[in-house]
């Protein structure tokens, strides 16, 4: 069983049920970045496992001291869960800090890391100094024939570097929209990817007030398969 992020702290009970259905064992748990909507449930479960075992934890190689000093535009969404995650895992012997361009194999799947927290993020961050989102994991997960591009919460600050550096590698048969479909990769980027389906980790109620509304309509108009929390539970088989 592989988990990527896991949601808010209040999502922990539901996530525990899913883990229990898989023998209370997690082979690999990826934390894209330490904002509360991504790491909250992990923090709760790791602090009180209740029988849950985790073989490996992979994070984005965040710089704890740097982020604490630089600050966080999302206040309690960023610094408090960062502090909790750091204190929980700093002495763990099963945590791996991923780096840009790293390649690994997990549960028979090939994973290529295109974005992680490093000096390149620091050089490209925008005026909001949103280091945690911009330093979020972006990685392609590939099985025998198909791939899934997970983009985390990477925002538009990183678009120029990522697409100039990796170009057509940044695609997949299935694609998760970056930063919940808001202020991340552009419409033209998703068109170029031409994925079979797009996943948005957001509820439809945000479509009228956030940029995701326009992106959602565009993808639907283009005839793309589109999933969000409103269509959950969502699943695909990665061949």
Task: Identify what each model region corresponds to.
Residues 2, 7-59, 165-182, 194-198:
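Active-site metal-binding motif and surrounding structural segment of the metallo-beta-lactamase
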């Amino acid at each position: 069983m592989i988990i990527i992020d896991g949601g808010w702290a209040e999502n922990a009970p539901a996530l525990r049920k899913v883990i229990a259905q898989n023998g209370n064992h997690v082979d690999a748990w990826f934390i894209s970045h330490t904002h509360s909507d991504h790491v909250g449930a992990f923090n709760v479960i790791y602090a009180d496992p209740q029988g849950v075992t985790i073989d490996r934890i992979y994070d984005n190689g965040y710089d704890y001291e740097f982020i604490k000093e630089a600050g966080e535009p999302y206040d309690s969404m960023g610094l408090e869960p960062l502090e909790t995650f750091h204190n929980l895992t700093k002495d763990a012997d099963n945590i791996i800090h991923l780096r840009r361009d790293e390649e690994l194999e997990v549960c028979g799947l090939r994973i290529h890391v295109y974005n992680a927290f490093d000096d390149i993020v620091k050089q490209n961050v925008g005026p909001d100094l949103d280091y945690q989102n911009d330093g979020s994991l972006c990685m392609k997960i590939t099985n025998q024939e198909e791939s899934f591009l997970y983009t985390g919460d990477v925002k538009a600050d990183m678009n120029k570097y990522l697409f100039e550096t990796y170009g057509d590698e940044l695609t997949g048969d299935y694609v998760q929209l970056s930063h919940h479909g808001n202020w991340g990769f552009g419409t033209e980027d998703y068109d170029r990817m031409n994925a079979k389906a797009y996943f948005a980790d957001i509820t439809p109620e945000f479509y009228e007030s956030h940029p995701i509304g326009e992106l959602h309509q565009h993808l639907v108009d283009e005839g793309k398969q589109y999933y969000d929390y409103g269509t959950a539970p969502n699943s695909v088989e990665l061949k």
